[in-house]
């Protein structure tokens, strides 16, 4: 199904993210296409600027779906990133969801992202690649950056940086003390003081674990009163997007000026910005 549509911008507070887009909003297209992953097939959702400057491999939260993240994906596209987001088997909108356990879905997620990375290499050769995720998708993206090496070599060599909105927390048996020490690329985690997940994260401070233990440079933004769905909060995203954009420009595209500006960035009143050097 090809649903190519023109995007007319982001309503409300989301429309002012990061002080304005690099590309006109009416030059951004959204559609979804078939994606073959091993012996099965899923959908690959694409949000594309007219003149791509890089590719963002995006992994959704557990049970979620790509279209739910329009605020973020459109903003990334406005900054020049083609966003490629597979519909994972654990999504409530995936037709075969019932046939996969949560444990099995993790491996399938990694396979999805590998297939998306192959599309990026084929369709956008030579462009820089980043990994972006929300919640369980943040873990997926961190794995593309080299995390959880004690389970398998998940590292995708093309990925230059990882951006995550919230994390799935310290999942017993999966997230060990060394989970993120094998990260081979810089990471930024955006979380909040109210970022809890029933049954998984009781203490919002658990989301700081990536920044505290990452093997490379790590940046953590903690938004005052931000919850687990912070990624869909237009007002909060507008407030924090300048740092996000600087991080992606600095480490995704190798912009030295952006790196210097990120170093000097100050969080708005009530928020926190924590930097861990490599």
Language-model features, listed with the residues they occupy:
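C-terminal segment of N-terminal export signals and the immediately downstream linker at the start
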Residues: 1, 21-34
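Alpha/beta-hydrolase-fold serine-hydrolase catalytic core, especially in secreted/extracellular enzymes
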Residues: 225, 234-278
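N-terminal export signals
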Residues: 5-24
């Amino acid at each position: 199904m090809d649903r190519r549509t023109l995007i007319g911008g982001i309503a409300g507070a989301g429309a002012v993210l990061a002080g304005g887009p690099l590309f006109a909003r009416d030059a951004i297209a959204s559609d979804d296409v078939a994606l073959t992953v091993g012996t099965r097939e899923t959908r690959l959702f694409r949000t594309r600027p007219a003149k791509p400057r890089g590719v963002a491999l995006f992994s959704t939260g557990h049970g979620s779906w790509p279209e739910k993240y329009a605020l973020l994906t459109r903003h990334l596209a406005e900054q020049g990133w083609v966003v490629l987001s597979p519909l994972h088997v654990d999504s409530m909108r995936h037709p075969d969801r019932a046939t996969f356990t949560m444990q099995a879905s993790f491996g399938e997620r990694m396979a999805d992202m590998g297939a998306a990375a192959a599309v990026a290499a084929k369709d956008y050769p030579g462009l820089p690649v980043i990994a972006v995720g929300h919640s369980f998708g943040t873990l997926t993206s961190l794995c593309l950056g080299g995390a959880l090496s004690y389970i398998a070599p998940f590292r995708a060599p093309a990925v230059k940086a990882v951006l995550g909105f919230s994390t799935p927390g310290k999942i017993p048996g999966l997230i060990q003390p060394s989970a993120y020490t094998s990260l081979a690329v810089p990471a930024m985690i955006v979380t909040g003081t109210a970022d809890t997940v029933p049954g998984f994260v009781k203490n919002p401070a658990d989301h700081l674990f990536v920044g505290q233990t990452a093997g490379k440079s790590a940046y953590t933004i903690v938004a005052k009163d931000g919850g687990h769905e912070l990624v869909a909060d237009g007002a909060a995203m507008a407030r924090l997007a300048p740092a996000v954009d600087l991080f992606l420009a600095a480490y995704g595209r190798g912009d030295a000026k952006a790196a210097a500006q990120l170093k000097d960035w100050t969080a708005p009143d009530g928020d926190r910005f924590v930097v861990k050097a490599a």
